[in-house]
UniProtKB/Swiss-Prot annotation:
It catalyses: (2Z,6E)-farnesyl diphosphate + 7 isopentenyl diphosphate = (2Z,6Z,10Z,14Z,18Z,22Z,26Z,30Z,34E)-decaprenyl diphosphate + 7 diphosphate; n isopentenyl diphosphate + (2E,6E)-farnesyl diphosphate = a di-trans,poly-cis-polyprenyl diphosphate + n diphosphate. The keyword Chloroplast does not apply. It comes from Mycobacterium leprae (strain TN). This is Decaprenyl diphosphate synthase. PROSITE patterns: UPP_SYNTHASE (PS01066). Keywords: Cell membrane, Magnesium, Membrane, Metal-binding, Transferase. InterPro entries: UPP_synth-like (IPR001441), UPP_synth-like_CS (IPR018520), UPP_synth-like_sf (IPR036424). Substrate binds at residues 77-81, 89, 93, 121-123, 125, 127, 244, 250-252. The gene is uppS.
């Protein structure tokens, strides 16, 4: 697969210029839910610039050739963050909401075009009934609460995952978000709920088997591209950079097919303590690596 889908020269730098000093900032974690600031209209009438980080840090300067097109993140550590503070696990999930939006803002500032966020895995159903119930309602509410903020910044939101067991209310809110942001092209955020890499591959395999059994597909002509075309979102590009927070070093069944040649970066911060500057640091490390894709 081509490393970068954009028609940019290696000398092009897709980062946004530094924001004016008085431009709105995010996040102010003194309240919950964290309030998203009112953003001034874009001079050209297009998507609004994301709020700058409260530190007023500026995205690093990376050329298009150095930048990952697709970043996948396992947002890990919410429960441990809460446990360390003597709080209920759900408090960690709640504090992670602002981080999702902050990282999305940072991805836009840096020039990343695809961001996949692991919000709820097919294995997470093994958690307590109480926590699963909370996570279903929480994901539904986060999508409802934040989709307008993301829309005005030019974000295209899409759900990636499987329907079985997933609450209908969650599916409905994701469908609304997807419809209202379908025309945006600043960045695509794949919000992965009830997602599992093995499940995705199994679903694709079943569909291919049905086509072959019906005589509509020659089994001898099945290739990697055939499988890709039958994944949940066939247009998702390969993952360039795979980030996991909390210090754990495993993929946890996320984007298995798409991450065949990804660069893994494991960061120690728990997700509620993470922010866009950590994403930028991961991208700088990625830019320093030599990706050979099997060549010498």
């Amino acid at each position: 697969m081509v490393r970068n889908e954009r028609t940019l020269k290696s000398t092009d730098f897709p980062q946004l210029p530094p924001a004016p000093d008085d431009y709105p900032t995010f996040p102010d974690k003194s309240t919950w839910p964290v309030v998203f600031p009112m953003l001034p209209p874009s001079p050209d009438g297009g998507p609004r610039r994301p709020p700058q980080h409260t530190s007023k840090a500026v995205a690093p300067r990376l050329s298009a050739a150095q930048l990952p097109t697709h970043v996948a993140i396992v947002m890990d550590g919410n429960g441990r963050w809460a446990n360390q503070r003597g709080l209920h696990r759900t408090e960690g999930h709640k504090m992670g909401e602002a981080v999702v939006i902050d990282v999305a803002c940072g991805a836009i500032e840096l020039g990343i075009k695809w961001l996949s966020l692991y919000a709820f895995s097919t294995e997470n159903w093994k958690r307590s009934v109480e926590e699963v119930r909370f996570l279903m309602g929480f994901n539904r509410d986060v999508v409802r609460r934040r989709r307008e903020n993301l829309k005005e910044m030019g974000v295209r939101i899409r759900w990636v995952g499987s329907r079985p067991r997933l609450w209908r209310s969650v599916i409905n809110e994701l469908a609304i978000a997807e419809h209202m942001t379908a025309g945006n092209d600043v960045i695509t955020i794949n919000y992965c709920v009830n997602y599992g890499g093995r499940t995705e591959i199994a679903e694709a395999t079943r569909e291919i088997a049905r086509l072959a059994a019906a005589g509509r597909l020659n089994p001898e002509r099945i290739t990697e591209s055939t499988i890709t075309r039958h994944l949940q979102r066939p247009d998702i590009p390969d993952v360039d950079l795979f980030v996991r927070t909390s210090g754990e070093q495993r993929s946890s069944n996320f984007m298995l097919w798409q991450a065949a040649y990804t660069e893994y970066i494991f960061q120690d911060k728990l997700w509620p303590d993470y922010d866009r500057r950590d994403l930028w640091a991961a991208c700088e490390e990625y830019a320093s690596r030599n990706r050979r894709f099997g060549s010498a």
